[in-house]
Amino acid sequence: EKKPSGTTSFDPLPAAQKIDELLNAHLKSENLKPNPLISDGLFLRRIYLSIIGRIPTILEANNFLNSNSKNKHSELIQKLLSNDAGYTAHHYQFWADLLRIPTNVDYTLYYREWIKSQIRNNTPYDDLVHQLVSGHGLIFDNPAAAYYLRDAGMALDNMSNSVRIFLGTRLECAQCHDHPFDKWTQMDYFKMAAYTYDFDVRMGVAKNSNRQRVYQDFGKRKNAAYKKEAGFEDFPHIHDESKIDEWLGQPYAPGYLERNNLTKEQFREAAVRAIAARKKVEEFDNPVSQSVNMLYGHISNVQVKHHDDKPLKLPHDYQYDNGAPEEIVKPGTMFGPEIPHLEDQTERKNAYANWLTSPENPRFTRVIVNRLWKRAFGHGIFEPVDNLTDRTEINQPALLRFLENLMQELDYDIRDFQNVLFHTELFRREMHLEDHSPGMKFHFAGPLLKRMSAEQIWDSITTLILPNVDTYAPNRKRTQERIARTKAIYQS
């Protein structure tokens, strides 16, 4: 069982000192010197922005700057990591961007609150990812299933995104052909996608449901009123009066008028009557239609399920010798241990999640430590963080190996891992202020200068205005009410 967040039992200093030793040895080998240490004031601002995403209040600043404790830097780090509200709010932005969580649909309310609870409870990273990629069922019962709702109707794209996010590997090109710049083949792509391709999302309700019959009845009523007032069963559909002359200007209009013995003026009068009749029905039905949409809109995305009759097939134009067009693809891993063939979809998905998050997976740990390193210091040990290939040049391999081992020794405890990074001398060094071009080696004499995020700027401004800014959540009650309403609507 994981220790509670904000624990003081973990000593980050030995690992932090080892990181500094590796960095200093590398700098020495390059005839470089580390940047000078920053002042307490700069450290104060940097650590607040890094851990809880805002500047300190005047009281918080004075408490730190006036402290005579020899360990005040470490004590402040521990205090901020123990600030569940501030830590969760700031780190949620990181995960929301990474997981591409939308904010404009109701189903994500459950998902967003669940992600925040995982951050707050310090769920191990491997456990969090396992829950996400193995998730299925109703989001009320298993909010992690909403990870697949993000790519509703795009099962192939979901696999590309998962591999990029969690393994730092770009497979998009291999969806259509063998990757031109990496070793992945189109068959590799489809074998990976076969693990999760059979998932689907319950988008609303069935075609023969009461809801659909209501919409069908609305449509029939409008069409009947339109045709009755026009006086012709085959009277053309014209949306509004401004389109009448446009229709009369079409090459097929004279033939229609002649067949029905109509002049242009008679046609125009019939169209005006028909449009008015349809609008009258719409005015009566629209409030009901809107009420139905309001009711069902809340539950249009609430479930991830498996299909028994949805095997993944190669494209109709598959051109390589290792398969035939429209051949059914069996799942297979792109690297690392093979997964035994499993017929049961849930077991197969769990086995895929086990493979993805395994310490034996050569990229799972490497990618997350590099992402967190870049978040702390402005530049990854390798770049880009989500385009790792066999040809990727890693400037400090010993440092990367140490960080991977550290993450595994910490059982993927994200707070403890960041605790180590924030205790390094590197974190307290002056930033690298010069332009750094992509592709150039970065030696970490100090962190790379980076701009504040929009959220950091906003939260820093509100810090100057609001008391208890970390716990200020005026919309929380409304959010919880919306969640409860959505669940009640579905269960009804």
Q: What are these regions, as identified by a protein language model?
A:
Residues 1-5:
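Extended acidic/polar, glycine-enriched regions
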Residues 11-45, 50-51, 55-86, 100-491:
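Primarily short, surface-exposed interaction patches in extracytoplasmic proteins
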Residues 89-93:
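Conserved AdoMet
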